[in-house]
């Protein structure tokens, strides 16, 4: 990711990361000496933090990395919805539109469009290793200087209320916004969710 940012040479840099993308954002923002053309200005951590709930990691590990084979985009969307109801209410049209970016043609059908090796950390993680990693992630978080927003699904099983509240008191002392009726993780399809992020990114430093 550092190599990509250096290749792009952005004039300004904001980071919006959900789940794993948020963890990568914490790693980058928590290391101010990384050779980047610019520092991250604003950071959005979507339903993720330094401490993650083990039961949620186990749940995600049960399906992540399985690419599947589908006859149509709609069939793929239906399969993803079956394991994604925690994303909160979506109309069928919204979910289909969201799903289209997640599939790719494969032979005569479709498969999920991501690297299955993404699942390796979930497959090798243990409750003990997850706890051990928390200290490192908290150290990175405490070192973040970017203005930070945490968005959390009020029913999230990955980012606990206690962790989210602790993140508002230490490190960058993030702003916390929760969305009712949503678990892990908000998709920002709903206008009220998108507005929170847009207002944060476009607002005054």
How would you describe each model-predicted region?
Residues 67, 71-124:
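Conserved alpha/beta-hydrolase catalytic His-Asp/Glu region
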Residues 7-54:
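Conserved hydrolase catalytic core segment
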Residues 9-11, 145-146, 173:
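Active-site acidic short loop of glycosyltransferases
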């Amino acid at each position: 990711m550092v190599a990509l940012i250096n290749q792009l040479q952005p004039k300004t840099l904001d980071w919006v990361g959900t789940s794993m993308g948020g963890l990568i954002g914490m790693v980058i923002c928590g290391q101010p000496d990384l050779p980047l053309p610019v520092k991250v200005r604003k950071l959005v951590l979507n339903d993720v933090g330094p401490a993650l709930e083990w039961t949620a990691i186990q749940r995600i590990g049960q399906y992540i990395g399985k690419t599947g084979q589908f006859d149509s985009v709609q069939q793929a969307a239906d399969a993803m919805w079956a394991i994604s109801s925690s994303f909160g209410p979506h109309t069928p049209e919204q979910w289909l539109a969201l799903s289209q970016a997640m599939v790719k043609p494969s032979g005569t059908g479709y498969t999920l469009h991501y690297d299955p090796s993404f699942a390796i950390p979930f497959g090798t993680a243990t409750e003990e290793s997850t706890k051990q990693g928390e200290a490192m992630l908290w150290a990175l978080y405490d070192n973040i200087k970017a203005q930070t927003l945490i968005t959390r699904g009020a029913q999230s099983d990955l980012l606990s209320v206690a962790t989210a509240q602790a993140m508002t008191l230490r490190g960058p002392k993030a702003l916390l916004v929760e969305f009712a009726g949503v678990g892990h993780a908000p998709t920002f399809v709903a206008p009220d969710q998108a507005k929170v992020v847009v207002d944060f990114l476009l607002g005054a430093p």
